[in-house]
A protein has these predicted regions:
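Charged, low-complexity intrinsically disordered regions
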Residues: 1-194, 284, 308, 312-316, ...
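Short coil/turn segments at secondary-structure boundaries
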Residues: 184-187, 198-206, 238, 500-502, ...
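Conserved pre-motif I regulatory segment
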Residues: 194-236
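Conserved SF1/SF2 helicase motif Ia
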Residues: 238-241, 246-277, 283-287, 442-447
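Glycine-rich, phosphate-binding/catalytic loops in enzymes
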Residues: 241, 252-253, 280-283, 332-336, ...
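Conserved helix-turn-beta segment of the N-terminal RecA-like "Helicase ATP-binding" lobe
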Residues: 270-297, 303, 307-310, 470-474
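Inter-lobe coupling linker of SF2 helicases/translocases
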Residues: 301-348, 353, 358-362, 366-397, ...
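Walker B catalytic acidic pair
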Residues: 401-402
């Protein structure tokens, strides 16, 4: 049974307004009073984008399989027999494209015009769909009799030229047929061009108990309003914008109004005392608990966590490394790991059925072994009754200062050797990710606040990492939970030969060279991000 509730106009008429309109239209069929909702929502719908405003590349995962198949058949003109064998499939589970029956077509277009004697056009298209640059290897035996792959630069260069011409042919073809054009525009607009930004105004907030000598600036009050009324937030504020006081005021005001029960501030280890003094400078009567190094020594940890759990504190301040020492319960960790393992096992079965790349299956087998080892380690650990878990300390909002220290979050990608992608797991990042998922569940996506002066410093991959921490559900709703889906929608990689760091020859390095569909990416990111630069 749907339980109606009142919302302010600025909240209701922002966010995913296309989805809200479709719900309002549905409800207004049964109940006339929802007609007014639909009328207001109609006025704030984003303007539909046209083909000229949408960038599409070969490999973009929101394009239906049937159109990729259509393109393949039009480009390579396989005979009727070959067509009956060839099928293009995309797996939501693994994020992998697969062309079945690649070897059925021996025509000149597949082997010569768009392919080479070493690689067929179908394999080149499959690699392109999976965002991989084509590479041709020769297999030789070293002095110990081991088989070694050696990159054939000449054949690779020829194959990559064919790959470039196929990609260009796809871009020339995709928007040509009117029916296909209309369908693709509709899919893109519904999925990505559906957000109306919400403006937050904190001018009405009274800040009871604040130091009367201190006046918060407008951008600070507005950011407090965002944290209180919006959901998970990222304060991307430059040094000097006062993000410490913004977070403190948001925590105190949220607690006063019953919007959260207990706030935990996770700050760089050497700044805990400075944070405490700034906290008390803004709210002199606040009741806060600050962790010292001693509190997290083995013999004192349980007692300190017990104080967090039972004390009626306005806020608790701990260091980054101390936060990691308050674990999620073993049961919850096992559940999360088991879910990931089930997904990977299904992915491997699917990949083998579809005859996917050996490389993909090997990567997934490696991930599977890693997850099994983690589960075994959890099972082998003695059940320590004296450990207080994160779920038990009663925290329902976490403020993470200098959140860029957590940007090294593992991601799986089919792309090879791409700059800026963490292929190793930083324990503190996976621990934080697990806790943000728990808080999302507990608070409906309102319990995580990040602050950093550098949300994106080296690579756009960091933007995706921030989105995973703060708006994972939004990524899932848009089919972007795989990094490769996100990358194929908003970015393009370029591969080039460069000198290997140890000077022992050349290697192929892939980098994100350009980004497109940026207005839609930024609109999505700004649902959580509050950015303040020096000139604002």
């Amino acid at each position: 049974e749907y339980e109606p509730k009142y919302l302010t106009a600025d909240e209701y008429l922002s966010g995913n307004v296309r989805e809200k309109l479709s719900q309002a239209e549905q409800f207004s069929k049964d109940s006339f009073e929802y007609r007014v909702n639909a009328e207001y929502l109609e006025k704030v719908q984003p303007k539909d984008l046209t083909p000229g405003e949408i960038s599409v590349k070969l490999g973009t995962t929101w394009i239906p399989e049937k159109y990729i198949e259509e393109f393949v058949f039009e480009l390579l003109s396989p005979n009727y027999y070959a067509q009956s064998k060839i099928e293009v499939k995309y797996s939501n589970l693994t994020g992998e494209w697969n062309i079945q029956g690649k070897s059925a077509d021996k025509g000149v277009k597949a082997t010569n015009t768009y392919g080479t004697s070493r690689i067929s056009a179908y394999k080149i298209i499959e690699d392109s769909l999976n965002l991989r640059d084509v590479r041709i290897f020769d297999y030789i035996y070293d002095e110990n009799g081991n088989k070694v792959a050696k990159l054939n630069i000449k054949e690779t260069t020829i194959a990559q030229q064919k790959q470039a011409s196929i990609k260009q042919a796809f871009e020339d073809w995709i928007w040509k047929a009117p029916v296909r054009r209309d369908d693709l525009c509709k899919i893109y607009n519904v999925r990505f061009n559906s957000i109306r930004p919400r403006e937050y105004d904190g001018s009405h907030i009274t800040f009871n108990g604040i130091n009367p000598e201190i006046a918060l600036r407008k951008h600070q009050k507005d950011a407090v309003a965002r944290i209180m009324y919006g959901g998970n937030s990222l304060l991307g504020h430059v040094v000097g914008a006062g993000k410490t006081w913004t977070m403190v005021a948001a925590a105190m005001e949220s607690r006063r109004l019953g919007l959260c029960n207990k706030s935990l501030f996770v700050v760089p280890n050497h700044l805990t005392e400075q944070w405490a003094s700034e906290f008390l400078q803004l709210y002199p009567a606040a009741n806060i608990l600050v962790a010292t190094k001693k509190d997290f020594e083995m013999k004192n940890r349980k007692k300190f966590c017990g104080r967090i759990a039972t004390g009626d504190y306005d806020a608790v301040i701990i260091g980054h490394s101390q936060f990691e020492k308050i674990p999620m319960s073993a049961e919850r960790q096992k559940t999360i790991l088991q879910n990931q393992l089930d997904e990977i096992i299904n992915g491997i079965i699917e990949a083998k059925t579809e005859n996917a790349e050996r490389y993909t299956v090997k990567q997934m087998e490696k991930t599977k072994r890693g997850l099994e080892a983690k589960i075994k380690k959890l099972n082998d650990q003695e059940r320590k009754d004296d450990v207080v878990t994160f779920e038990e300390i009663g925290v329902d909002r976490v403020f993470v200062d200098e959140a860029h220290y957590y940007k090294n979050l593992f991601l799986y990608t089919k792309m090879r050797n791409v700059g800026g992608i963490a292929q190793t797991e930083a324990q503190k990042s996976s621990d934080l990710f697990m806790k943000t998922q728990y808080l999302d569940e507990l608070t409906g996506g309102k319990g995580v606040i990040f602050a950093t002066g550098t949300p994106v410093s080296n690579s756009m991959v960091e933007l995706y990492t921030m989105q995973r921490y703060l708006q994972y559900k939004s990524l899932q709703e848009r089919g972007l939970q795989h990094f490769d889906s996100w990358a194929s929608t908003f970015g393009e990689t370029v591969s080039a030969m460069e000198l290997a760091p140890e000077g022992s020859g050349y290697r192929m390095k892939t980098r994100f060279a350009k980004f497109f569909n940026l207005p839609e990416l930024i609109a999505m990111f700004k649902e959580v991000a509050d950015i303040q630069t020096a000139d604002m």
